[in-house]
Amino acid sequence: MSMSQSRAVQRSSSPNEDRGENQLVVYDLKGNDDTEEEVLPVQSQPLSSRTQCPSIGAFTVQCASCFKWRLMPSMQKYEEIREQLLENPFFCDTAREWKPDISCDVPADIYQDGTRLWAIDKPNISRPPAGWQRLLRIRGEGGTRFADVYYVAPSGKKLRSTVEVQKYLNDNSEYIGEGVKLSQFSFQIPKPLQDDYVRKRPARLLDSIDNTNTPVAKEANPLAWISPDDHISLQLGTPTESGLNNSHYQPSKKKKTSTLSIFGSNDELADR
């Protein structure tokens, strides 16, 4: 969820967001709250410089009924929930699969307390084909882009755009024979809620710098897997921190939806 990183849907304050329904992605900036429940231990450190890149740390999903955040037991479960989040909103009862005593009456697993960087992402991202990985690399604060997405084929080949994926599939038709489709790939990235995390660029430079102009499959959306040489641990958070307008980030009560969340740390974590 942090490839949460996650699953669930929530209203966005931006009119440009698709249908106003998005996921939340969280990246650890300062450290863990010892009172929070842990799935896997995350050891965090303060950012030593603006160029230090946060790592993805954990996955969470927001209940569509009580709006509390629930930790996901694994990135795989997070991706499973995220893939059909619009059609099947997440509820606390769903978490009984891995936590039998959970309900909306149980306090949230985690709260947003200023120790993590949140970013908005979209639900219903297709899971990568079997044997493939979808990777999200977060860039350091102050850069011109928040993150990069790329895929790793079973052969180990890294693909950084839809064009590269299409060419690779054309050159390796056995994957097409196995049912791999271009619609299973997405290179959209999350959007940080911290306004100054990404350095503003002149409008005339956007088209030449931003590499998201390549065609994106309609069925695919954003977020990420962790690279074999990336580092990961798991944990979670909720959008009620001062400075955030709760009306912007509270799912509409007319239609029950959920929100997904992931967060990370600046530490080097064990390889997956």
Curated annotation (Swiss-Prot):
Function: Probable transcriptional regulator.
The name this protein goes by in its record: Methyl-CpG-binding domain-containing protein 2
PANTHER family: METHYL-CPG BINDING DOMAIN PROTEIN-LIKE, ISOFORM C (PTHR12396:SF0), METHYL-CPG BINDING PROTEIN, MBD (PTHR12396)
Subcellular location: Nucleus
Principal localisation: nucleus
GO molecular function: DNA binding; enzyme binding; zinc ion binding
Domain (MBD): residue spans on this chain: 118-192
Residue runs in coiled coils: none
Location of region: Disordered: 1-24, 236-272
Any one GO BP annotation for this protein: chromatin remodeling
Zn finger residue spans: CW-type: 53-112
PROSITE patterns: MBD, ZF_CW
Domain characteristics, as noted in the entry: The methyl-CpG-binding domain (MBD) functions both in binding to methylated DNA and in protein interactions.
Biased composition annotated in UniProt, kind: Polar residues: 1-15, 236-250
Keywords: DNA-binding, Metal-binding, Nucleus, Transcription, Transcription regulation, Zinc, Zinc-finger
UniProt short sequence motif MBD-associated domain (MAD), positions renumbered to this chain: 62-104
GO cellular component, one term: nucleus
Keyword Nucleus: yes
Annotated SMART domains: MBD (SM00391)
Lineage per the UniProt record: Eukaryota, Viridiplantae, Streptophyta, Embryophyta, Tracheophyta
Binding site for Zn(2+): 63, 66, 92, 104
Self-association state and partner proteins as the record states: Interacts (via MBD domain) with DDM1.
